[in-house]
Swiss-Prot record:
Keywords: ATP-binding, Cytoplasm, Cytoskeleton, Hydrolase, Nucleotide-binding. This is Actin-7. The lineage of its organism: Eukaryota, Viridiplantae, Streptophyta, Embryophyta, Tracheophyta. Its main location: cytoplasm. InterPro entries: Actin, Actin/actin-like_CS, Actin_CS, ATPase_NBD. It is found in: Cytoplasm, Cytoskeleton. One of its GO terms (cellular component) is cytoplasm. It comes from the Eukaryota. The gene is ACT7.
Amino acid sequence: MAEEDIQPIVCDNGTGMVKAGFAGDDAPRAVFPSIVGRPRHTGVMVGMGQKDAYVGDEAQSKRGILTLKYPIEHGIVNNWDDMEKIWHHTFYNELRVAPEEHPVLLTEAPMNPKANREKMTQIMFETFNCPAMYVAIQAVLSLYASGRTTGIVLDSGDGVSHTVPIYEGFTLPHAILRLDLAGRDLTDNLMKILTERGYSFTTTAEREIVRDIKEKLAYVALDYEQELDTARSSSSIEKSYELPDGQVITIGAERFRCPEVLFQPSFIGMEAPGIHEATYNSIMKCDVDIRKDLYGNVVLSGGSTMFPGIGDRMSKEITALAPGSMKIKVVAPPERKYSVWIGGSILASLSTFQQMWISKAEYDESGPGIVHMKCF
């Protein structure tokens, strides 16, 4: 097989979802939950060909008989056996490729511990025998996907949010802020406020329903107090949602109360800055000369930035914090749910990137530490 025919694989491992596909494509081929499920009661059904572990959608659909585990918490891998299962499933079942034939680009959370990057590298070369691999920082890929090399990325997924300032393609590690507030917390918050309305959602299965309600109906208010007044005085913002059993529920103020937590974490008892303030704090930790470039390029990325109205609200809030004359631009690309993956697809297919891969030979010579020399 000629060198040119080999498409690199791009795999973005998020806390909630794995996004995987081939470099050069404009969207991931496989998107599935980052879950590994193991049977709670083994050996009940002899001869049923029960597997010892299920991954992704299959684990989700059989969740009644399984114990579900998320190997990635707050963006960082903490269970390598399960993570290996997820990668195995990605290559062999979802993409149906032999990993020993393709270079693999993986993504990592900002400030991922050094030992973790080494472990990822080791698994790719030793377990999957990849010919080459690379580890890229998620936020940087999102910035590339938006066609920029300088800006500040607010990346908010299911398990963690980060504000990452990037200048000429390099992250500024001292100014990165992590906020353990993301999609899962918003879903939990919506479960709680729906309970106040008299609807009860408690199990993990019901959490998935609430997540769907959140994704379909929630939005960010430009002015929270004013929106509350509107909600009290009229039914204009009420929407109905049909549950799987056919029951129809109505939700009003909950629609914008749910994601308001991103701006006011105190709503769920968190002592943390909102995403607007974290973005501002991140910018203020950077050199005074580059702040103007960051204010003018605030890029939203990740599934938890998909709420309608979030861009305008971010713009309003950052404008209120920034110096008066500062020009502020918040960019919310329509494909931002997958922009990390898309950035990886762009990067891995660049001709200039081809000398950046860590090859199997380099790994064999230097060991896992090679990742710190070649991946920034």
